[in-house]
Amino acid sequence: MLFASGEQAYVAAQVLDTRFTPDGADPGWADEVVASLGAGERAMCALSFAAGAPGLAHRVVGSEHALQRFEQGPDVDRSYDVTEFPTPDEYAAMVRTALERIATGALHKVVLGRCLDVVSEPPLVPAEIIDRLLTTRPGRYVFSVPLVSGSADGTAPDDGPILVGASPELLVRREGLEISCTPLAGSVPRSADPDEDARRAAGLQESGKDLAEHAFVVEAIVHALKEVCVEIEYPATPELLSTDTVWHLATPIHARLAAGADGPSALRLAQLLHPTPAVGGVPTAAANAVIADLEGDLRDWFAGCVGWVDADGDGEFAVTIRAAVMDGPRLRLFAGAGIVAGSDPASEVRETGAKLATMARVTGLP
């Protein structure tokens, strides 16, 4: 179990207990999690996408150190059975339906996702996937969090589903009174040709559609932060942030807790901000209704958030994108794209395909 940020990783050595909740948005549960922590302990947490959906927190002790790779055995020849759902054509139809609803004025933006199910023989090994994520770094925030309780001896469970990934998106970080967020919204697939790659990056910065999509997210986060923060600062125009497969528009936001050290913990802040329009939409309720209608129960833990909090309330949470759920031989990947007026269904299929490719490569798929 680990959470890596930049070049540092926190690795849990022992799981003391696990607290589940049927509603990851419950602030009382978050307060109980933080209150349960002793000196030197952290809670490694995961929240589902939807309000009223599960959350969990593993109370752990561990250590923080420079990133290092896991020891691996020899390469293993594997066969893969890959299922894409919805299919690209079905996803394009979902986008068209969303655009029709946007045209009525019922909503301004909605994020729609699709999945890959990968079944490998022999089964993939979690440490192998984490090692590849730490090596390739498709996102700054690498994580591995079991979705079941730890073993009786205090170790992480040997079986059961595990949430793994490498997210490029910081939901929130609390360091004392300092609060940071870096929302991403608006993206374009990268190109292997340097000139074309630069052209795409420049085009993204000038895209009215993508800038509008990004503005929805920044406005929502700033509005939420005003409930608990002062001195909120952010640039007038977004920056470019790149992964190995995608260019993103990003806006770094900084603020200070208004209530000082008695302000909300990092876990409470994650609940306050999540889900942002970067994974949901605007207005929130209307977008969530469209997501439930068109996606069904596709998301589960995807497009949620994952991270840690300590006894002082400090911590760091990333948005659960560029992620997979591993369960035995099966690995499910998820990627989404923001749909606004002017979105092109074929372009959104390509964008989600590029995002899925980030995680597909770490499974060993060509």
Roles of regions detected by a PLM:
Residues 6-14, 21-22, 52, 56, ...:
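Contiguous alpha-helical scaffold segments within structured protein domains
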Residues 1-52:
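A generic N-terminal leader/anchor concept
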Residues 2-19, 114-212, 216, 227-233, ...:
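An anion-binding catalytic pocket shared by soluble metabolic enzymes
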